[in-house]
Swiss-Prot record:
Residues 242-255, 333-347, 363-385, 396-418, 497-506 have a biased composition (Basic and acidic residues). GO terms for biological process: regulation of myoblast fusion. Keywords: Cytoplasm, Membrane, Nucleus. The keyword Nucleus applies. The gene is plekho1a. This is Pleckstrin homology domain-containing family O member 1-A. C-terminal fragments could be released during apoptosis via caspase-3-dependent cleavage. Residues 1-23, 208-296, 313-439, 497-520 are annotated as: Disordered. Gene3D superfamilies: Pleckstrin-homology domain (PH domain)/Phosphotyrosine-binding domain (PTB).
Amino acid sequence: MKKSHLVKRGLQDANQPSSQPDKVGWIRRFSGKGIFREIWRNRFVMLKGDHLFIFEKEMKNNGKTHEVFDLVHYERSEELRKAKSHSKKNHSKFTLLRCQHPGNKSPNLVFLAVSPEEKESWINVLNTAITRAKNRVLDEVTIEEESLLAHPTRDRAKIPLGRRLPTRGHLMAVGSASSDGMLTLDLVNEEDAAMLDEDEWLKDHRASLDKLAPGRRRAGTDASRPPASNTEAQEKTSSLPRKSEISWSQEDHPRTPQNKKKFAQVRNRCASMDDALSRGERKPKKNIPSPTGHLQDLITQRLQRTQELLAQIQEQEPHRGRMGSYPYLRGIDSPRLRHLKGSDSPHSKGSSSPHSANSPSVRAKDSPSSKSKESPHAKSKDSPRFKSSKNALRSKSIDSPDSKESSSLHMKCIDLTHIKGSQSPLSTGSNSPHMKSTDFYQMSYSPNFRNMKGGDSPLGEALDWDSRRAAAERLLQEAISSWREAKEVLAEVKELQARQRREELSKTGMASQKLQQKSP
């Protein structure tokens, strides 16, 4: 039976390789299956290098090889055992598996050793030879002398270890002595580049700050720069300022270097160290100042707005203080005018005029509604709060040059309505409905008062001004209430800040305790 699957068939001289073989011995080789049983033939096998030689007879001086197998085409050698076989041959079989590369025609070899120990020995030797054959391509690589790497510093003279590096002054002297002077120019340019102006350094510092912390920029405003004015900040939003914005707006000027040497140090440091240090330096301070200034600015803005409204009302009535200068009011000595001038008024101490005797407002003094003026609710008009608000309003709205005529009819009428009418929002202490409307409406519904009120008389204009003044007082009351609300909000903010500080202190204390417990 001819074997057509052999790798090499021919006559080769076994003595040709001069080195000693790795292993030799007789092994039975599997040659196929017969009709009733497997066919095993004895062969003399020799392993030398990365080749496996198989002989039919024992090798002699002029022995010729029967088959030669190159172990490069094989993958590994392993034990071959059937699952349900109790034969002694089952314990000594091993195989040599070929590689699964395309075009590889080497056969799988199956051998039967004399004993299991001999089988293990052949498996180990064959696996070692296969590994050596795989690495043969790398071992055969030779490097020619011409292709060696050139070492430009191998033959260079070495500097002694104790020698110092040249200083800048020495380099400047050498550069000035040279003909071209390029070295001197380079050194001077390097020094000029190191000595940057503080403005340029601050611009770079701010640019890097914006790149590192883009979250600080919100709604088109740069939080790293302080706002231009408080009014501009309040026009943008009417709510309380944020915590991060407070910390960056109230922070002092950016840290500038102390001397010129720090510029060169900052420029020479590596970027990673600069970023790491700058992140730590740019953290906001833990002790954030309280936002009292912003709240006070908000309150003062509300008060300024109220003053502006009062000033606008005063400008709308430029002739309100000139009522005493009308010629038809100077020479008139009528009882009706004396009734309104104050001393003979029925709402003052007493009156002897016929109009005051017959006026329904005089009779109203004995009414039960007028007696309620002596009640404790009516006494609240004389409280310090009422007096202070009244004086503040008078100082803001009546101190103009047009309103300095204190004896005019207009001012007396306004004082009369303040004392008797109690329509001002500041006199909130009088909770009685009779207290608010009795005297003023009795006087307004009297026939004498109706005659004075009709037409375009100055008294009608004074009453119109009184209603506008009441509106101004209402605005002032709203400003005072908003100021109180701002104070309450400020107290809440302070309480929240104190709570956050206590939580931070407790966290740091717990962390320090854990570190102390871990350290021993």
